[in-house]
Amino acid sequence: MSTTVLPPPDKKAEYVERMFSRIAPGYDTMNGIITLGLDREWRATTVALAAPPSCGRALDIGTGTGDFLVELTAWMPDGLAVGVDFTVPMMRAGLPKIRDRRAVFVAGDALKLPFADESFDAITTGFTLRNVTDIAAAFREMWRVARVGATVACLEVARPRHPLLRAGHWFYFQRIVPLMARALGADPEAYTYLPQSARIFPPPEELAQIMRAAGWSDVTYRLVGLGAAAIHTGIKRG
């Protein structure tokens, strides 16, 4: 059994910010390797479900190096995609991606977004919520800055339902991923934290209930990657 690296709740935000600052230079490469390249397809599906209007404004929360901004700007040739994150080195690493695109990075906290009420026509977030200290508060903030009729689409980790797939998923993320990180010269603690944080993340139906309690309507989800991830959507009704 591997030793836990999960921080106590009152230290989590600081821990996460420092961790992502350390791994920012190699984050995209490792993310692609860990997900076997499927993360690109999952992001494209998430943005399609959010369906941002071509001339509207979309927000990506926990944007990291801006992969979602690339997808959003493809949908919004006359709009603006805004990515918010509290880890500045991650956004700095992503600046080349958004050059010549209608997109901007903004430093900010998912639990206290630096935007006015009803500012955005669509909201996306990917692999972010397991790193926040209060998932319900994050969804309430998303609801606050969303315009009436806006869709939120959330890509997050899940655990396969089939026992064999579930066992294989556990072994891969708990054992293989940290070894891969060491072999590739990546931060071993960070790539131990990531699977450990995924393991305690709420399952899809529980996450859907959290979204509903935060005010989102018509909440649903679909599993992708043989159940290794889930995409939740909700709509802000008037």
Curated annotation (Swiss-Prot):
GO terms for molecular function: demethylmenaquinone methyltransferase activity. Keywords: Menaquinone biosynthesis, Methyltransferase, S-adenosyl-L-methionine, Transferase. SUPFAM superfamilies: S-adenosyl-L-methionine-dependent methyltransferases. Pathway: Quinol/quinone metabolism; menaquinone biosynthesis; menaquinol from 1,4-dihydroxy-2-naphthoate: step 2/2. One of its GO terms (biological process) is menaquinone biosynthetic process. Methyltransferase required for the conversion of demethylmenaquinol (DMKH2) to menaquinol (MKH2). HAMAP family: MenG_UbiE_methyltr (MF_01813). Its EC number is 2.1.1.163. S-adenosyl-L-methionine binds at residues 65, 85, 109-110. It comes from the Bacteria. Coiled coil: none annotated. This is Demethylmenaquinone methyltransferase. Belongs to the class I-like SAM-binding methyltransferase superfamily. MenG/UbiE family. The lineage of its organism: Bacteria, Bacillati, Chloroflexota, Chloroflexia, Chloroflexales. It catalyses: a 2-demethylmenaquinol + S-adenosyl-L-methionine = a menaquinol + S-adenosyl-L-homocysteine + H(+). It comes from Roseiflexus sp. (strain RS-1). Gene3D superfamilies: Vaccinia Virus protein VP39. InterPro entries: SAM-dependent_MTases_sf, UbiE/COQ5_MeTrFase. The keyword S-adenosyl-L-methionine applies. It holds the Pfam family Ubie_methyltran.
